């Protein structure tokens, strides 16, 4: 926190010294009737009367999009852990006759596999035990595990040819979200906030919500850097909303502090920050001021956003929020995502854990699909009914796929699957994506891409293109180099664009 004691006396102007004399620590905390513990800067938020002028414009760095934008916002349904494409979207009926046989060397082609299966004596082929059917006018193949998703196949583009360089969770997730396997780069949502700015001055441009699935309860952790801003200004990092009645930490007034007092506190801190900016020229001070003011406004906007009492029973039922067996956290988050989209939030990230199914996959994936199938489909249907799907891009998928061979013992009704980055499936809907298609093909074993490969950088380049952004031109100069989400690669996949 900036205090008057940070400023050398020989560097302050008369005006600054006058203000500093007024704002001694005793005077500041005495007037606000709060001790350090109850009035920490993390809690310098408030709402009574009108908010002060916004410290930052909220505009993005781009004066306008490079292309006509088809999408204005993104809802990213991230399935953490790596869903099995072979049990959900990549139908391989020919594998039934190969059950238990060794994965051919001609298919593996010497590719590395994780240490969890590299020591197995055999790599037995494990065909899915679940049935697939074709759905909609598109005739897209979808597993019986996803009956609700099957009902929206004419609205989604299923991509079966994604591939990634990483085979472990953290680097793969970091790569998908930031364009680099190494931590420290800005996330996709942060790039969009930086480039396009926010559309609502009372809510962040980038919001994150996390839920735990009923599948693998010991799934990999989700680190906050996955929605971080890296080296771009911190005002562009995501804001996590927790479940429950208090979604944002320190948003409510602490005991003994009303909105008027909070407003005065914030004004004084703003003055101190202005002095610091004048003295040191640190651009992050503007970010700090903007974040305090945004938090102040959120005291009213967030309770209104998260109040579902005005939603109809039909809407609540459509998402399955109160249904037994449907994860209320994810279902509720999907409905909140629609409400955020209505209010202009630029990037909405839902992260649902539990897909890391190395063993006991058939049992775990049933529950996991029940968690997300109905709410995901309901979100697409709800957006479409309200006229929002046209300019809202919805994305569903994880950081990689799963192997065709079984991890551990293969039995009649049980198997596990290891990590597999050579090919996996995701889908997108709305926002100018091409509906009712299946894009890309894999070989007969679902092990390698054989047509229309979509590396992660291409996927992200395509997302940016739908938002009207040339991925090669949204850059940030850091340590003498112009960085971008797609690094030095990336090719827009026109086949995914309507």
Where on the chain are the PLM-derived regions?
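Ligand-binding pockets and gating/stacking loops
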Residues: 2-498
